[in-house]
Each structure stands twice: as C-alpha cells, then as structure tokens.
UniProtKB/Swiss-Prot annotation:
Recorded family membership: Belongs to the fimbrial export usher family.
Disulfide bonds: 807-829
Signal peptide range: 1-25
Domain of life: Bacteria
One Pfam assignment: PapC_C
Protein topology in the membrane: Multi-pass membrane protein
Keywords in alphabetical order: Cell outer membrane, Disulfide bond, Membrane, Plasmid, Signal, Transmembrane, Transmembrane beta strand, Transport
Function comment: A probable role in capsular biogenesis. It is likely that the caf1A molecule binds F1 antigen subunits during the extracellular secretion process.
Descriptive protein name: F1 capsule-anchoring protein
Recorded name of the encoding gene: caf1A
Organism: Yersinia pestis
Location of the protein in the cell: Cell outer membrane
A GO term, aspect molecular function: fimbrial usher porin activity
Gene Ontology BP terms: pilus assembly
Amino acid sequence: MRYSKLFLCAGLTLATLPCWGRAYTFDSTMLDTNSGESIDVSLFNQGLQLPGNYFVNVFVNGRKVDSGNIDFRLEKHNGKELLWPCLSSLQLTKYGIDIDKYPDLIKSGTEQCVDLLAIPHSDVQFYFNQQKLSLIVPPQALLPRFDGIMPMQLWDDGIPALFMNYNTNMQTRKFREGGKSLDSYYAQLQPGLNIGAWRFRSSTSWWKQQGWQRSYIYAERGLNTIKSRLTLGETYSDSSIFDSIPIKGIKIASDESMVPYYQWNFAPVVRGIARTQARVEVLRDGYTVSNELVPSGPFELANLPLGGGSGELKVIIHESDGTKQVFTVPYDTPAVALRKGYFEYSMMGGEYRPANDLTQTSYVGALGMKYGLPRNLTLYGGLQGSQNYHAAALGIGAMLGDFGAISTDVTQADSQKNKQKKESGQRWRVRYNKYLQSGTSLNIASEEYATEGFNKLADTLNTYCKPNTRNDCRFDYAKPKNKVQFNLSQSIPGSGTLNFSGYRKNYWRDSRSTTSFSVGYNHFFRNGMSLTLNLSKTQNINKYGEKTSELLSNIWLSFPLSRWLGNNSINSNYQMTSDSHGNTTHEVGVYGEAFDRQLYWDVRERFNEKGRKYTSNALNLNYRGTYGEISGNYSYDQTQSQLGIGVNGNMVITQYGITAGQKTGDTIALVQAPDISGASVGYWPGMKTDFRGYTNYGYLTPYRENKVEINPVTLPNDAEITNNIVSVIPTKGAVVLAKFNARIGGRLFLHLKRSDNKPVPFGSIVTIEGQSSSSGIVGDNSGVYLTGLPKKSKILVKWGRDKNQSCSSNVVLPEKTDISGAYRLSTTCILNN
C-alpha cells in the first residue's frame, strides 16, 4: 500500500507539468550562405521534396504490387500541401483495386489522374526516403485474387509480329568397310503471325528421305468475355471424354488458362509457417509448380496449377537468412473433376484429317460438356458423330475422402465400317487414384470394351479409302477387348523411391495381346551421388499366337567430382545395360558445364561384352548463345563413325527490327533495353541482349503477371537501368514488349557554378534534358554525381518553384576518366530569367 501511494503522488505531480514540443525548420540563409539570396525551402520545411517524376515501390494494404516511375504533383489535402501521386484508373486496376465500384474516381472528365480519396476510408502515404508509395483501401475495394489471373482490362494482346521457331539437324555416318556413307538431314519450322488478338500458327517438317510434311496450320483467337477460344483450321478435338482426333474445321471451347485454376479443378492447400519473409517453392515430380514470396508467419497457397493427377508435393521454404524448411503434402484428384458450379464445354465440326492422304473425306462433329456438382461430384458427357458413326458418353467423377478419388464413364457407339454390317457396343472406363500417408501412391486405369461391337471414330473412318488406293490403304480389323494399367510408387524414408507399373491389352477373336511391366528404384544421396535401378519386360503375342518378349535391366550411377576438382560443375557416371539376348553394355562418362553454364559437354566410352567385343566413344557438345543454340556430336567404333551438328533458335520480326534468340514457347516477351548489349535476361544460360539491346524471352504464362528480369551484375560499366524487372501480362500466343528504361553513358562528378558566380544551392534537383526522372541532388559543395550521360548533353537544375530559381548547362564529357572510371568536370550553369 505504501508503494501505491508513492506512485500515485508521483503520477499526479508529473501530470501537472507542461510538455513543450518544437518544430524544426530549415534556415535558407544557413543552407546557402554563399549565394546571398533567399532559397525556397518551404517544401523541405514541410518534409516534402520538389514535385516531379520519381521511381517508387507501390504497396496496397502492405503488399507490394508494382515498381516504376510515377509523377508526383503538389496538391492540397485537409489544408496541407502534399506530394500527391498522379495515377490512372488502369494503374489502380493493375494494383488490384476495383474501380468499377467507385465512379467518382474519375475527376474533371479525364482519366489522367484519378481522385484516390473517392474511395471511402482510403489513405495515401508517400515515404520519399524509402521510395515507397503506400495505398490503404478497405478490403471490399479490392478485386478478388484468383490464382494469379490478372483483371481482363490488363491483358495484353501484344504487338504485331512475325516469328519462327526452327530446329535443324544433320547426321552423317561413314562405314569402315567399303567406304560408304549415309547422310540424314532434318529441319522443322514453326512460323507464326500475330495481328491483334488473332494468332496464325503452322508447323512444317522436312526429311531428306521423305520431303516436306505439314503437321498443322490454323488461326485462333481468345474470346475473353466468355473465357473461350476460337480455332479455325487444322487442330484436334477435345480428349477428356472421347479419344482426340485430328480435324480441319472450326472449334470453340472453354480456355482453362483464362480461368483461375481453383474455380475449375481440385487442388490441395499448402499451409505452413515462414520464420522470415521467405520464398515458398512447391514442386511436383521435381518440377516447380509454384514459387511465391510470403511474409513471415502463417501462409496458405490454395490455387496450385497441378493439372489433375495424384501424388506428393514437395514444399521448400527458402528463408531470407539462408535456411530452408522442407515438407511434403499428399493429394488426390479424379480423372475428370470440376469445382462446384463451374461449366466447361467444347464444340467442333469439320473434316477428319488423318495422317495419310489415302482416306476418304469425312465430316465429323463433337460436343462435350462438364459441370461441377455439390458434394465433390462432377457430371460430364458428350456426343460425337459422322456419316457412319454416332456415339454418346456419360460419366461422373467423385472425391471419396480417405478412400481416394474415382471417375467412371460409359460410351455407347453405333458404327458401320466400310463394306461391313452395322455394329453397336459400349465401352466402360474407370480411373482410381489413392495416396497414403506412408508414401504409397496408387493409380489404376481400366478400359473394358463390354461388347465386341464397339468401335472408335478413327478406327471406323480409316476403313473408307479413296478409289484405287485399296491395296495401299491398310487398316487393322482387330478390336481391343480390354485394357488395364496401373502405377504404384512407394517412398522409403531416407532410402529413395520404389516404382512399379504394369500394362495389359487384349483383343477380340484372336489371341493377340500386349503385356508389359517395369520396376524402378532411385535414390539421391546427401553427397550429390544418385543411383537408379530399372527392370522392364514386354511381351507381345500376334494374331497367329507367336510370342516375342524382351527383358531389359539397367543400372545408372552418378557422382560429382567437385570434391577433387574444386567448385566446378563436373560429374561422372557409370551405366550398365543388359537385355534378354545376353548383350551387356558398360558405359562410363564425364559431363559438366562451362562458360557460365552456356556450354554443356559430355564424353563417354562404351564397352560390349558379348561375342565380338567392341568399344565405342562419343563426344557431345551443346552451346546456348545470344542468337540461338548449336549442338554437335561425334562417335566412333570398330565399324563406323558418326558426325552430327544441330542448330535451333527463334526469330521475331516486329516494328523494332529482326531479333534472333534461343528457342521460345508460344507466348513471348520482346525484351527492349536500347543500346545495352550482353545483359543476361532471366538468368537462363546464354540468354542475353543482342548488339541493339533486344532479345526474345519465351515460355511466358498467359493471363498472369510475368516478371522479366535483367541481371544488373551483367550490365556494361557505362549502362544503367532504372528498374531491372518489368511485368507483362500477355494473352495466349502474344508477343508483348518488355521495355526497360535504359541509359547509356558516362559517370560524372560535376561541380556546378551559376552564371552570377554564386554556387548552386544545396538540395537542388538535377535532371538530364529529355529524361523525365530526376538524375541527382546537389550536395553542400555544389557537386552532383550523374550517371548515364551521353558524350554531349544538357542538364537542368532547379531549386525552387519560380522560373528564376533554375539554370541549365551544356555538358561535354572529358576525354579521360579517373582511376574509378568516372569523369570529373566543372561547369557554369546559366540562370533562367
């Protein structure tokens, strides 16, 4: 009680004491004692900077959404003058803000700068020293975040472009006996043309022995509002319900890539706790399916692009302190499964397009639909037909919880093959998946042809041959009776993985069948070694009852040599292969990478034990460069030698010229960093900007934000980019421009003096004419450090709001630099009156 009274008295005494605070301001005369004039420091006294264009990181509700240059202007809010960002409605949409809910955002009839405070309970903070712009909005003002799918308004159809992926190969073999040689030449060309939303694609191959062959040619475009895709030309029918067939016609179908994955397919939820701000990597079968940055604390990744199937996800949490957390997440999905309420469809019609030109022209059509029901059920079905073929299918998929996942469907087909009677039959199909916590994964698929009268569409149409081609138009009347396949995988903690797989197919009326099975084991050791064991057997019985079988075993061992050769990417391996005929082959090799992973090399020697023993040697090289990829191989043994060379890459023609690079996928970013040559893009071996500062960056994911990155370490000494990461959101098949703001020029320590012989005030903003962002700030000795200066330039200096509080000067870089590689110069700044 005594202490309570003492604390109470002390508290009352302190509460009666006044508290003084003081606002500190800049004295302009102290800042510029040599200039003799009053400097406008009112903005600095308010904790502000001069208005202008600044590079900032943008955060919405604490989450970083963008980085870039933003124009800041002086505006009054609540009676205070503030530096206020000028943001467009398109930028807010990109940041994930639902602008349609707030029509008052657009002020004065223009979309140049929206009224950010039109969103109730919102707040804007600009932290100049941190280069951070923070926007706080209520949760209901945000657009839903669906699996990385960006708002439709931000989808970029790209620029007009003509491009081509190419792959060429030449092999020549010389035989020691007789001196004969055998040459083989191959080329594959995949040209494409983009005009607006339309995509024109083709694929053509050429063999020396067979000549030219076209695989496909078609035009397609996205129908964004209905999340579908229209295709005209040579394509394939949907394969989820009926067997896919090649057609030439029209197809319209749901485009799953436009829709958040979790809305249409089942996927597991990955949960964990990050100790620091971390990068969470999720792998499926060794391939990365998700790579997300998360803040410290609990996290949840619910929308993973797995594409069906079952198995185990490996989750690696890369903490910012360099440590890792690793755990696994098992999952099951049925063969056909949609989320509740999601509808998917596919319609097509046209001519059947077989691989040979001996089959008669037949018109076909197909319709397929799938719908997600409550209680983890999916109903699906479809129709397929031609002049002599009609089929209908109906199926259902279900999640069974602890019992796994299953889907089953039945197809009724009525058909008539050429010069045969009409037939009718059914096919049942069942798929089952189950994963156990013990690390066991079971996948069983069974197709049972319940009646002999069932035929597939392609099997029926292939019997109708063109006139006078009967002898060349061969087809097999054999009908599959049933087919069963299974895959079983068992993880052994600390000891690797064991895999089993089997397959059997039987036919009606005769004894023909195909049976195969395989057993495999693999283990990766902590020291980098790896061991793989495989045993497989295949047995075929033809219609005459003749049996052939093949037994094959393989041992593969790899171990790193870095322990003895230093920190080099060099490995050695041993492989033994044995077959049922008694042939045993041993192979040893050394392989690795060099020149910043651009060159892959592989040297091998092989020895055969059986009969006439022989050895063979082989050398393989592969180089990935700025303008493409080149490979070569050479091998020889006692009977022959072989030499080969291959070249592949990509070429894009746009309004910016011709850009050659490594082979890309269908969706491409044209990287533009003017005049910056040799900069690495995306950390992919050999992918660098060409002599103009351009390159092709492929394999982008459509309708999602893709980050294209230039490695700043690889920039030339005289180059600078304001931001080394550019975000693009392409539509499927687009060629989008990834533009980097680049400056090429010298680094300069510049001492400024005004034309009235007074020093330039401390804190003055210096910009280079023709550039929107500030380049430097004048120090206390009228000095400023500038980068990216051309040989000749004009600088603009401003230290106040009035015109007479600015000056300009023409700068010509000296001939020589100092020891640090920077120029040093003094110049007079001409006052603007």
